[in-house]
Amino acid sequence: MSPTDMKAVVFYGPHSIAIESRPIPKVQHDKDIVVKVSASGLCGSDLHYFRGHEVVDSAGFIMGHEFVGEVVEAGRAVTTVRPGDKVVSPFTVSCGDCFYCKLQNSSRCVHCQVFGSNGLDGAQAEYVRVPLADSTVVRAPPGLSDDALILMADIFPTGFFGARNAMAGLGAQDPTEAVVVVIGCGPVGLCAIVSALEYRPRVVFAIDSVDSRLGLAEKLGARPLDLKKGVPSIISAVQEVTEGRGADAVVEVVGQGPALRTAYDIIRPFGSISSIGAHHSAMPFSATDGYE
Protein backbone atom coordinates (compact mmCIF):
# COMPACT_ATOMS: atom_id res chain seq x y z
CA MET A 1 0.00 0.00 0.00
CA SER A 2 1.48 3.35 -1.02
CA PRO A 3 1.58 6.43 1.29
CA THR A 4 -1.31 7.88 -0.72
CA ASP A 5 -3.59 4.94 0.08
CA MET A 6 -5.36 3.67 3.18
CA LYS A 7 -7.32 0.64 4.29
CA ALA A 8 -11.10 1.00 4.45
CA VAL A 9 -14.24 -1.09 5.05
CA VAL A 10 -16.32 -0.89 1.87
CA PHE A 11 -20.02 -1.80 1.65
CA TYR A 12 -21.13 -3.58 -1.53
CA GLY A 13 -24.56 -4.80 -0.51
CA PRO A 14 -26.31 -7.03 2.03
CA HIS A 15 -23.83 -9.44 3.61
CA SER A 16 -21.10 -8.12 1.30
CA ILE A 17 -18.31 -5.95 2.68
CA ALA A 18 -14.60 -5.86 1.93
CA ILE A 19 -11.42 -4.33 3.31
CA GLU A 20 -9.81 -2.48 0.44
CA SER A 21 -7.13 0.07 -0.36
CA ARG A 22 -8.64 3.47 -1.12
CA PRO A 23 -7.01 6.87 -1.76
CA ILE A 24 -6.48 8.93 1.38
CA PRO A 25 -9.07 11.75 1.15
CA LYS A 26 -7.98 15.34 0.64
CA VAL A 27 -9.56 18.70 1.39
CA GLN A 28 -11.95 19.44 -1.49
CA HIS A 29 -13.57 22.64 -0.21
CA ASP A 30 -12.44 25.49 2.02
CA LYS A 31 -14.58 24.28 4.93
CA ASP A 32 -13.34 20.67 4.82
CA ILE A 33 -10.97 18.91 7.18
CA VAL A 34 -9.32 15.51 6.92
CA VAL A 35 -9.17 13.42 10.09
CA LYS A 36 -6.85 10.53 10.88
CA VAL A 37 -9.23 8.10 12.59
CA SER A 38 -8.25 6.69 15.98
CA ALA A 39 -11.63 5.14 16.90
CA SER A 40 -14.74 4.35 14.88
CA GLY A 41 -17.96 2.83 16.20
CA LEU A 42 -20.20 0.16 14.75
CA CYS A 43 -23.82 1.29 14.91
CA GLY A 44 -26.99 -0.75 14.80
CA SER A 45 -27.92 1.14 11.63
CA ASP A 46 -24.76 -0.25 9.99
CA LEU A 47 -26.27 -3.67 10.64
CA HIS A 48 -29.48 -2.54 8.91
CA TYR A 49 -27.43 -1.97 5.76
CA PHE A 50 -25.52 -5.22 6.19
CA ARG A 51 -28.65 -7.31 6.73
CA GLY A 52 -30.54 -5.66 3.88
CA HIS A 53 -33.20 -4.05 6.05
CA GLU A 54 -32.35 -0.64 4.62
CA VAL A 55 -31.99 -0.42 0.86
CA VAL A 56 -29.37 1.89 -0.66
CA ASP A 57 -29.42 3.28 -4.20
CA SER A 58 -25.84 2.26 -4.89
CA ALA A 59 -22.98 0.69 -3.01
CA GLY A 60 -19.20 0.91 -2.94
CA PHE A 61 -18.97 3.48 -0.15
CA ILE A 62 -16.86 3.38 3.01
CA MET A 63 -18.94 2.60 6.10
CA GLY A 64 -18.87 4.21 9.55
CA HIS A 65 -20.59 7.33 10.89
CA GLU A 66 -19.25 7.81 14.42
CA PHE A 67 -15.59 8.52 14.98
CA VAL A 68 -12.77 10.17 16.89
CA GLY A 69 -9.48 11.27 15.41
CA GLU A 70 -6.82 13.90 14.81
CA VAL A 71 -7.13 16.69 12.26
CA VAL A 72 -4.32 16.34 9.70
CA GLU A 73 -5.48 18.83 7.08
CA ALA A 74 -7.84 21.81 7.20
CA GLY A 75 -9.33 24.05 4.52
CA ARG A 76 -8.47 27.73 4.63
CA ALA A 77 -11.98 28.73 5.80
CA VAL A 78 -11.96 26.40 8.84
CA THR A 79 -11.69 28.40 12.08
CA THR A 80 -12.67 26.16 15.01
CA VAL A 81 -10.08 23.39 14.68
CA ARG A 82 -6.63 23.03 13.19
CA PRO A 83 -4.18 20.24 12.39
CA GLY A 84 -3.17 18.40 15.54
CA ASP A 85 -6.52 18.83 17.30
CA LYS A 86 -8.36 15.72 18.45
CA VAL A 87 -12.03 15.88 17.42
CA VAL A 88 -15.28 13.97 17.84
CA SER A 89 -17.80 13.87 15.01
CA PRO A 90 -21.54 13.17 15.00
CA PHE A 91 -23.06 11.02 12.29
CA THR A 92 -24.18 13.91 10.06
CA VAL A 93 -22.63 16.98 8.49
CA SER A 94 -24.48 20.23 9.19
CA CYS A 95 -24.09 23.89 8.21
CA GLY A 96 -25.07 25.58 11.48
CA ASP A 97 -26.96 28.37 9.68
CA CYS A 98 -30.12 26.95 8.11
CA PHE A 99 -33.65 26.89 9.57
CA TYR A 100 -33.20 23.43 11.12
CA CYS A 101 -29.71 24.04 12.48
CA LYS A 102 -30.88 27.19 14.24
CA LEU A 103 -33.59 25.11 15.92
CA GLN A 104 -30.89 22.61 16.99
CA ASN A 105 -32.37 20.02 14.63
CA SER A 106 -29.07 19.65 12.80
CA SER A 107 -29.78 16.12 11.56
CA ARG A 108 -32.30 17.74 9.19
CA CYS A 109 -29.88 20.43 7.98
CA VAL A 110 -30.60 21.42 4.38
CA HIS A 111 -26.96 20.61 3.62
CA CYS A 112 -27.00 17.40 5.64
CA GLN A 113 -24.85 14.49 4.59
CA VAL A 114 -24.55 11.21 6.47
CA PHE A 115 -21.13 9.66 6.91
CA GLY A 116 -20.98 6.11 5.60
CA SER A 117 -23.55 6.53 2.83
CA ASN A 118 -23.82 6.99 -0.93
CA GLY A 119 -23.14 10.69 -0.60
CA LEU A 120 -20.21 10.69 1.81
CA ASP A 121 -17.61 8.08 2.67
CA GLY A 122 -17.47 7.13 6.34
CA ALA A 123 -14.85 6.56 8.99
CA GLN A 124 -14.32 2.82 9.12
CA ALA A 125 -11.04 3.71 7.47
CA GLU A 126 -7.71 5.23 8.39
CA TYR A 127 -8.77 8.72 7.25
CA VAL A 128 -12.03 10.52 6.60
CA ARG A 129 -12.96 13.84 4.99
CA VAL A 130 -15.35 16.05 6.98
CA PRO A 131 -17.23 18.79 5.09
CA LEU A 132 -18.49 21.89 6.94
CA ALA A 133 -16.10 21.11 9.76
CA ASP A 134 -16.72 24.22 11.89
CA SER A 135 -20.36 23.27 12.49
CA THR A 136 -19.87 19.51 12.48
CA VAL A 137 -16.96 18.35 14.64
CA VAL A 138 -16.27 19.16 18.30
CA ARG A 139 -12.79 19.51 19.75
CA ALA A 140 -12.27 16.72 22.29
CA PRO A 141 -11.62 17.75 25.90
CA PRO A 142 -8.20 16.71 27.19
CA GLY A 143 -7.66 13.63 29.31
CA LEU A 144 -10.39 11.40 27.88
CA SER A 145 -9.64 8.09 26.18
CA ASP A 146 -10.84 7.24 22.69
CA ASP A 147 -13.07 4.58 24.26
CA ALA A 148 -14.86 7.29 26.23
CA LEU A 149 -14.92 9.84 23.41
CA ILE A 150 -16.42 7.46 20.87
CA LEU A 151 -19.54 7.22 23.03
CA MET A 152 -20.08 10.94 22.44
CA ALA A 153 -20.11 10.61 18.64
CA ASP A 154 -23.52 8.93 18.36
CA ILE A 155 -24.30 6.42 21.10
CA PHE A 156 -24.67 8.67 24.12
CA PRO A 157 -26.19 11.68 22.29
CA THR A 158 -28.86 9.42 20.81
CA GLY A 159 -29.77 8.04 24.22
CA PHE A 160 -29.74 11.52 25.73
CA PHE A 161 -31.91 12.86 22.90
CA GLY A 162 -34.47 10.11 23.46
CA ALA A 163 -34.62 10.69 27.21
CA ARG A 164 -34.76 14.47 26.87
CA ASN A 165 -37.64 14.32 24.39
CA ALA A 166 -39.56 11.89 26.57
CA MET A 167 -39.14 14.05 29.65
CA ALA A 168 -40.04 17.21 27.74
CA GLY A 169 -43.43 15.63 27.08
CA LEU A 170 -44.24 15.63 30.79
CA GLY A 171 -45.44 19.21 30.55
CA ALA A 172 -46.47 20.53 33.96
CA GLN A 173 -45.79 17.23 35.73
CA ASP A 174 -42.93 17.27 38.24
CA PRO A 175 -40.16 15.08 36.73
CA THR A 176 -39.30 13.76 40.19
CA GLU A 177 -42.77 12.21 40.39
CA ALA A 178 -42.57 10.59 36.96
CA VAL A 179 -42.42 6.90 36.12
CA VAL A 180 -40.15 6.37 33.13
CA VAL A 181 -39.63 3.21 31.07
CA VAL A 182 -36.73 2.49 28.71
CA ILE A 183 -37.35 -0.37 26.27
CA GLY A 184 -34.09 -1.91 25.09
CA CYS A 185 -30.92 -2.01 27.17
CA GLY A 186 -28.21 -2.09 24.54
CA PRO A 187 -25.57 0.65 24.52
CA VAL A 188 -27.98 3.39 23.43
CA GLY A 189 -30.65 2.20 25.85
CA LEU A 190 -28.20 2.24 28.74
CA CYS A 191 -27.24 5.80 27.80
CA ALA A 192 -30.94 6.69 27.75
CA ILE A 193 -31.25 5.26 31.26
CA VAL A 194 -28.30 7.30 32.52
CA SER A 195 -29.82 10.42 30.96
CA ALA A 196 -33.32 9.77 32.32
CA LEU A 197 -31.93 9.25 35.82
CA GLU A 198 -30.47 12.77 35.72
CA TYR A 199 -34.05 14.06 35.97
CA ARG A 200 -34.43 12.19 39.31
CA PRO A 201 -37.71 10.49 38.38
CA ARG A 202 -39.53 8.36 40.93
CA VAL A 203 -38.54 5.21 39.08
CA VAL A 204 -36.93 4.21 35.80
CA PHE A 205 -37.91 0.77 34.53
CA ALA A 206 -35.60 -1.02 32.08
CA ILE A 207 -37.06 -3.65 29.74
CA ASP A 208 -34.99 -6.28 27.93
CA SER A 209 -34.77 -10.05 27.52
CA VAL A 210 -30.98 -10.34 27.92
CA ASP A 211 -29.96 -10.97 31.52
CA SER A 212 -26.56 -9.27 31.23
CA ARG A 213 -28.12 -6.10 29.86
CA LEU A 214 -30.74 -6.05 32.60
CA GLY A 215 -27.93 -6.47 35.12
CA LEU A 216 -26.10 -3.44 33.73
CA ALA A 217 -29.32 -1.40 33.76
CA GLU A 218 -29.88 -2.32 37.40
CA LYS A 219 -26.32 -1.29 38.32
CA LEU A 220 -26.99 2.11 36.76
CA GLY A 221 -30.06 2.57 38.96
CA ALA A 222 -32.95 1.29 36.87
CA ARG A 223 -35.51 -1.30 37.93
CA PRO A 224 -35.22 -4.29 35.54
CA LEU A 225 -38.23 -5.90 33.88
CA ASP A 226 -37.54 -9.17 32.08
CA LEU A 227 -39.32 -9.40 28.74
CA LYS A 228 -39.03 -13.19 28.88
CA LYS A 229 -41.79 -13.10 31.50
CA GLY A 230 -44.16 -11.62 28.92
CA VAL A 231 -45.62 -8.22 28.15
CA PRO A 232 -48.59 -8.66 30.54
CA SER A 233 -46.20 -8.93 33.50
CA ILE A 234 -44.48 -5.72 32.37
CA ILE A 235 -47.78 -3.89 32.06
CA SER A 236 -48.75 -5.10 35.52
CA ALA A 237 -45.46 -3.93 37.06
CA VAL A 238 -45.83 -0.45 35.57
CA GLN A 239 -49.49 -0.13 36.54
CA GLU A 240 -48.70 -1.25 40.08
CA VAL A 241 -46.62 1.86 40.76
CA THR A 242 -48.87 4.29 38.85
CA GLU A 243 -52.28 3.51 40.35
CA GLY A 244 -53.19 1.76 37.11
CA ARG A 245 -52.47 4.75 34.85
CA GLY A 246 -49.36 3.57 33.03
CA ALA A 247 -45.95 5.13 32.53
CA ASP A 248 -45.56 8.87 32.21
CA ALA A 249 -42.74 8.62 29.66
CA VAL A 250 -41.33 5.79 27.55
CA VAL A 251 -38.11 5.71 25.53
CA GLU A 252 -38.22 3.00 22.85
CA VAL A 253 -34.71 2.09 21.68
CA VAL A 254 -35.24 -1.21 19.85
CA GLY A 255 -36.58 -0.24 16.44
CA GLN A 256 -39.02 -3.15 16.12
CA GLY A 257 -42.80 -3.05 15.88
CA PRO A 258 -43.42 -5.18 18.99
CA ALA A 259 -41.25 -2.86 21.08
CA LEU A 260 -43.14 0.21 19.91
CA ARG A 261 -46.41 -1.59 20.57
CA THR A 262 -45.22 -2.35 24.10
CA ALA A 263 -44.50 1.36 24.56
CA TYR A 264 -48.06 2.10 23.49
CA ASP A 265 -49.46 -0.56 25.82
CA ILE A 266 -47.70 0.79 28.92
CA ILE A 267 -48.00 4.56 28.39
CA ARG A 268 -50.69 6.49 30.23
CA PRO A 269 -53.13 8.83 28.46
CA PHE A 270 -51.27 12.06 27.58
CA GLY A 271 -47.99 10.30 28.29
CA SER A 272 -44.95 10.74 26.07
CA ILE A 273 -43.31 8.08 23.87
CA SER A 274 -39.89 8.92 22.47
CA SER A 275 -38.97 6.37 19.79
CA ILE A 276 -35.33 6.45 18.71
CA GLY A 277 -35.06 2.93 17.34
CA ALA A 278 -34.59 2.70 13.55
CA HIS A 279 -37.88 1.26 12.27
CA HIS A 280 -38.51 -0.49 8.96
CA SER A 281 -42.09 -1.70 9.40
CA ALA A 282 -45.55 -0.18 9.66
CA MET A 283 -46.73 1.47 12.85
CA PRO A 284 -48.03 -1.22 15.23
CA PHE A 285 -51.02 0.88 16.26
CA SER A 286 -53.47 3.04 14.35
CA ALA A 287 -54.57 6.65 14.65
CA THR A 288 -57.83 5.31 16.07
CA ASP A 289 -55.90 3.42 18.74
CA GLY A 290 -54.08 6.60 19.63
CA TYR A 291 -57.27 8.61 19.84
CA GLU A 292 -58.85 6.11 22.18
UniProtKB/Swiss-Prot annotation:
Binds 1 zinc ion per subunit. Its EC number is 1.-.-.-. NAD(+) binds at G184, C185, G186, P187, V188, G189, D208, R213, I276, G277, A278. It is an enzyme of class 1 (oxidoreductase). It comes from the Eukaryota. Zn(2+) binds at C43, H65, E66. One of its GO terms (molecular function) is zinc ion binding. The keyword Membrane does not apply. SUPFAM superfamilies: GroES-like, NAD(P)-binding Rossmann-fold domains. Pathway: Mycotoxin biosynthesis. Its cofactor is Zn(2+). Keywords: Metal-binding, NAD, Oxidoreductase, Zinc. Substrate binds at Y49. The keyword Zinc applies. PANTHER family: DEHYDROGENASE, ZINC-CONTAINING, PUTATIVE (AFU_ORTHOLOGUE AFUA_2G02810)-RELATED (PTHR42813:SF2), ZINC-TYPE ALCOHOL DEHYDROGENASE-LIKE (PTHR42813). Medium chain reductase/dehydrogenase; part of the gene cluster that mediates the biosynthesis of UCS1025A, a member of the pyrrolizidinone family that acts as a strong telomerase inhibitor and displays potent antibacterial and antitumor properties. These compounds share a hemiaminal-containing pyrrolizidinone core fused with a gamma-lactone, giving a furopyrrolizidine that is connected to a decalin fragment. Belongs to the zinc-containing alcohol dehydrogenase family. This is Medium chain reductase/dehydrogenase ucsI. It comes from Acremonium sp.
